[in-house]
Amino acid sequence: MSGLHILAFGAHADDVEIGMAGTIAKYTKQGYEVGICDLTEADLSSNGTIELRKEEAKAAARIMGVKTRLNLAMPDRGLYMKEEYIREIVKVIRTYKPKLVFAPYYEDRHPDHANCAKLVEEAIFSAGIRKYMPEVPPHRVESFYHYMINGFHKPNFCIDISEYVSQKVEALEAYESQFSTGSDGVKTPLTEGYVETVVAREKMFGKEVGVLYAEGFMSKKPVLLHADLIGGCK
Protein backbone atom coordinates (compact mmCIF):
# COMPACT_ATOMS: atom_id res chain seq x y z
CA MET A 1 0.00 0.00 0.00
CA SER A 2 1.06 3.60 -0.47
CA GLY A 3 2.28 5.27 2.69
CA LEU A 4 0.54 7.63 5.07
CA HIS A 5 1.76 11.18 5.30
CA ILE A 6 1.18 11.21 9.08
CA LEU A 7 0.74 8.42 11.63
CA ALA A 8 -0.15 9.53 15.16
CA PHE A 9 0.15 7.14 18.10
CA GLY A 10 -1.66 7.46 21.42
CA ALA A 11 -1.87 5.31 24.52
CA HIS A 12 -5.65 5.68 24.58
CA ALA A 13 -8.34 6.82 22.17
CA ASP A 14 -8.69 10.62 22.75
CA ASP A 15 -4.95 11.19 23.42
CA VAL A 16 -4.24 12.14 19.82
CA GLU A 17 -7.33 14.36 19.69
CA ILE A 18 -6.26 16.24 22.81
CA GLY A 19 -2.82 16.92 21.41
CA MET A 20 -3.30 17.46 17.69
CA ALA A 21 -6.89 17.12 16.44
CA GLY A 22 -6.68 20.55 14.83
CA THR A 23 -3.49 19.70 12.97
CA ILE A 24 -4.96 16.43 11.73
CA ALA A 25 -8.14 18.16 10.53
CA LYS A 26 -6.01 20.76 8.77
CA TYR A 27 -3.91 18.23 6.88
CA THR A 28 -6.75 15.88 5.93
CA LYS A 29 -8.59 18.93 4.55
CA GLN A 30 -5.53 19.56 2.36
CA GLY A 31 -5.71 16.01 1.01
CA TYR A 32 -3.01 14.36 3.11
CA GLU A 33 -3.49 10.81 4.39
CA VAL A 34 -3.44 10.62 8.18
CA GLY A 35 -3.73 7.54 10.38
CA ILE A 36 -4.12 7.01 14.12
CA CYS A 37 -2.96 4.02 16.16
CA ASP A 38 -4.23 3.67 19.74
CA LEU A 39 -2.11 1.26 21.76
CA THR A 40 -4.71 0.25 24.36
CA GLU A 41 -8.49 -0.10 24.58
CA ALA A 42 -8.47 2.11 27.70
CA ASP A 43 -10.28 -0.64 29.56
CA LEU A 44 -9.32 0.80 32.96
CA SER A 45 -10.92 4.19 32.29
CA SER A 46 -13.16 5.33 35.13
CA ASN A 47 -15.99 6.07 32.70
CA GLY A 48 -17.22 4.35 29.56
CA THR A 49 -16.74 0.83 28.22
CA ILE A 50 -14.41 -0.62 25.60
CA GLU A 51 -17.27 -0.83 23.11
CA LEU A 52 -18.37 2.75 23.74
CA ARG A 53 -14.82 4.09 23.52
CA LYS A 54 -14.40 2.37 20.15
CA GLU A 55 -17.56 4.00 18.81
CA GLU A 56 -16.45 7.38 20.13
CA ALA A 57 -13.04 6.92 18.49
CA LYS A 58 -14.69 6.15 15.15
CA ALA A 59 -16.84 9.27 15.43
CA ALA A 60 -13.84 11.44 16.30
CA ALA A 61 -11.90 10.01 13.35
CA ARG A 62 -14.73 10.91 10.97
CA ILE A 63 -14.81 14.45 12.31
CA MET A 64 -11.06 14.83 11.70
CA GLY A 65 -11.21 13.23 8.26
CA VAL A 66 -9.18 10.19 9.33
CA LYS A 67 -9.88 6.99 7.40
CA THR A 68 -7.31 4.72 9.07
CA ARG A 69 -7.57 4.06 12.80
CA LEU A 70 -6.11 1.02 14.54
CA ASN A 71 -6.15 -0.33 18.07
CA LEU A 72 -3.41 -2.73 19.20
CA ALA A 73 -5.28 -3.79 22.39
CA MET A 74 -2.19 -3.61 24.58
CA PRO A 75 -2.87 -3.63 28.35
CA ASP A 76 -4.08 -0.36 29.83
CA ARG A 77 -1.62 0.73 32.55
CA GLY A 78 0.70 -1.96 31.22
CA LEU A 79 2.67 -0.13 28.54
CA TYR A 80 6.13 -1.20 29.57
CA MET A 81 9.24 -1.54 27.44
CA LYS A 82 8.61 -5.04 26.11
CA GLU A 83 9.98 -6.47 22.89
CA GLU A 84 6.58 -7.84 21.88
CA TYR A 85 5.06 -4.34 22.06
CA ILE A 86 7.90 -2.82 20.06
CA ARG A 87 7.47 -5.49 17.39
CA GLU A 88 3.73 -4.79 17.10
CA ILE A 89 4.38 -1.09 16.60
CA VAL A 90 7.14 -1.84 14.09
CA LYS A 91 4.63 -3.88 12.06
CA VAL A 92 2.25 -0.92 11.98
CA ILE A 93 4.99 1.48 10.89
CA ARG A 94 6.23 -0.86 8.17
CA THR A 95 2.70 -1.59 6.95
CA TYR A 96 1.53 2.02 6.73
CA LYS A 97 4.91 3.57 5.83
CA PRO A 98 4.33 7.01 7.37
CA LYS A 99 6.44 10.00 6.45
CA LEU A 100 5.92 11.66 9.84
CA VAL A 101 5.14 10.02 13.18
CA PHE A 102 3.69 11.71 16.26
CA ALA A 103 3.42 10.41 19.83
CA PRO A 104 2.76 11.95 23.27
CA TYR A 105 5.46 13.97 24.96
CA TYR A 106 7.52 12.14 27.57
CA GLU A 107 6.64 14.52 30.40
CA ASP A 108 3.03 13.80 31.36
CA ARG A 109 1.22 12.97 34.58
CA HIS A 110 -0.08 9.71 33.07
CA PRO A 111 2.67 7.03 32.90
CA ASP A 112 1.05 5.37 29.87
CA HIS A 113 1.53 8.54 27.83
CA ALA A 114 5.24 8.70 28.59
CA ASN A 115 5.69 4.98 27.97
CA CYS A 116 3.82 5.25 24.67
CA ALA A 117 6.37 7.85 23.56
CA LYS A 118 9.26 5.58 24.51
CA LEU A 119 7.80 2.52 22.80
CA VAL A 120 7.12 4.44 19.60
CA GLU A 121 10.63 5.91 19.56
CA GLU A 122 12.14 2.44 19.94
CA ALA A 123 9.88 1.09 17.21
CA ILE A 124 10.75 3.90 14.79
CA PHE A 125 14.44 3.07 15.15
CA SER A 126 13.90 -0.68 14.78
CA ALA A 127 11.53 -0.25 11.82
CA GLY A 128 14.43 1.03 9.73
CA ILE A 129 16.74 -1.90 10.48
CA ARG A 130 16.65 -4.39 7.60
CA LYS A 131 17.62 -7.45 9.65
CA TYR A 132 15.12 -6.69 12.45
CA MET A 133 11.96 -8.70 11.71
CA PRO A 134 13.23 -9.42 8.16
CA GLU A 135 9.88 -10.92 7.15
CA VAL A 136 8.52 -7.35 6.85
CA PRO A 137 10.39 -4.85 4.63
CA PRO A 138 12.00 -1.99 6.60
CA HIS A 139 10.73 1.58 6.57
CA ARG A 140 12.50 4.72 7.73
CA VAL A 141 10.35 7.49 9.18
CA GLU A 142 11.50 10.94 8.09
CA SER A 143 10.61 12.83 11.28
CA PHE A 144 9.29 12.09 14.78
CA TYR A 145 7.44 14.71 16.81
CA HIS A 146 5.67 14.88 20.16
CA TYR A 147 2.30 16.42 20.98
CA MET A 148 1.08 17.48 24.41
CA ILE A 149 -1.74 15.88 26.36
CA ASN A 150 -1.85 17.05 29.98
CA GLY A 151 1.21 19.27 29.97
CA PHE A 152 1.87 22.94 29.25
CA HIS A 153 5.38 22.72 27.85
CA LYS A 154 7.37 25.16 25.76
CA PRO A 155 6.91 23.87 22.19
CA ASN A 156 9.71 23.72 19.63
CA PHE A 157 7.23 24.67 16.91
CA CYS A 158 3.52 25.38 16.51
CA ILE A 159 0.92 24.73 13.82
CA ASP A 160 -1.83 27.27 13.18
CA ILE A 161 -5.24 25.64 13.80
CA SER A 162 -7.31 28.83 13.93
CA GLU A 163 -9.65 27.56 11.20
CA TYR A 164 -9.87 24.08 12.73
CA VAL A 165 -10.29 24.67 16.47
CA SER A 166 -14.05 24.05 16.20
CA GLN A 167 -13.31 20.66 14.63
CA LYS A 168 -10.90 19.92 17.45
CA VAL A 169 -13.59 20.68 20.03
CA GLU A 170 -16.11 18.58 18.10
CA ALA A 171 -13.67 15.65 17.96
CA LEU A 172 -13.06 15.89 21.70
CA GLU A 173 -16.77 16.14 22.45
CA ALA A 174 -17.26 12.88 20.53
CA TYR A 175 -15.79 11.29 23.68
CA GLU A 176 -18.85 12.09 25.73
CA SER A 177 -18.09 9.26 28.16
CA GLN A 178 -14.76 10.87 29.03
CA PHE A 179 -15.39 14.61 29.07
CA SER A 180 -18.83 14.75 30.71
CA THR A 181 -20.43 12.92 33.62
CA GLY A 182 -23.48 10.92 32.69
CA SER A 183 -26.01 9.52 35.12
CA ASP A 184 -23.72 6.59 35.94
CA GLY A 185 -20.39 8.40 35.52
CA VAL A 186 -17.88 9.57 38.10
CA LYS A 187 -15.93 12.80 38.31
CA THR A 188 -12.39 12.67 36.96
CA PRO A 189 -9.85 15.32 35.88
CA LEU A 190 -11.31 14.95 32.37
CA THR A 191 -14.87 15.84 33.37
CA GLU A 192 -14.01 19.09 35.14
CA GLY A 193 -13.63 21.56 32.28
CA TYR A 194 -10.84 19.64 30.58
CA VAL A 195 -11.83 20.49 27.01
CA GLU A 196 -11.98 24.18 27.90
CA THR A 197 -8.50 23.92 29.40
CA VAL A 198 -7.13 22.35 26.22
CA VAL A 199 -8.68 25.10 24.08
CA ALA A 200 -7.20 27.73 26.41
CA ARG A 201 -3.77 26.15 25.96
CA GLU A 202 -4.07 26.30 22.18
CA LYS A 203 -5.20 29.92 22.43
CA MET A 204 -2.12 30.70 24.54
CA PHE A 205 0.18 29.04 21.98
CA GLY A 206 -1.63 30.92 19.24
CA LYS A 207 -1.03 34.22 20.99
CA GLU A 208 2.68 33.44 21.29
CA VAL A 209 3.03 32.87 17.54
CA GLY A 210 0.61 35.54 16.36
CA VAL A 211 -2.48 33.54 15.40
CA LEU A 212 -5.78 32.81 17.15
CA TYR A 213 -5.14 29.15 18.00
CA ALA A 214 -2.14 26.86 17.58
CA GLU A 215 -1.05 23.40 18.67
CA GLY A 216 2.45 23.02 20.06
CA PHE A 217 4.91 20.23 19.32
CA MET A 218 8.34 19.07 20.43
CA SER A 219 11.19 17.66 18.38
CA LYS A 220 14.50 16.11 19.43
CA LYS A 221 16.24 17.45 16.35
CA PRO A 222 16.15 20.90 14.72
CA VAL A 223 13.17 21.60 12.48
CA LEU A 224 13.86 22.88 8.95
CA LEU A 225 11.67 25.83 7.97
CA HIS A 226 9.92 25.71 4.60
CA ALA A 227 9.61 29.50 4.53
CA ASP A 228 12.27 32.08 5.27
CA LEU A 229 12.16 34.26 8.36
CA ILE A 230 10.44 37.16 6.60
CA GLY A 231 7.65 35.01 5.20
CA GLY A 232 8.82 34.27 1.68
CA CYS A 233 9.23 30.89 0.09
CA LYS A 234 12.32 28.83 0.80
From Swiss-Prot:
Bound cofactor: record note: Can also use Ni(2+), Co(2+) and Fe(3+).
The entry's keywords: Hydrolase, Metal-binding, Zinc
Pfam families associated with the record: PIG-L
Gene3D superfamilies: LmbE-like
Record entry for activity regulation: Inhibited by BSH.
Superkingdom classification of source: Bacteria
Family, per entry: Belongs to the PIGL family.
Protein name: N-acetyl-alpha-D-glucosaminyl L-malate deacetylase 1
Protein's organism: Bacillus anthracis
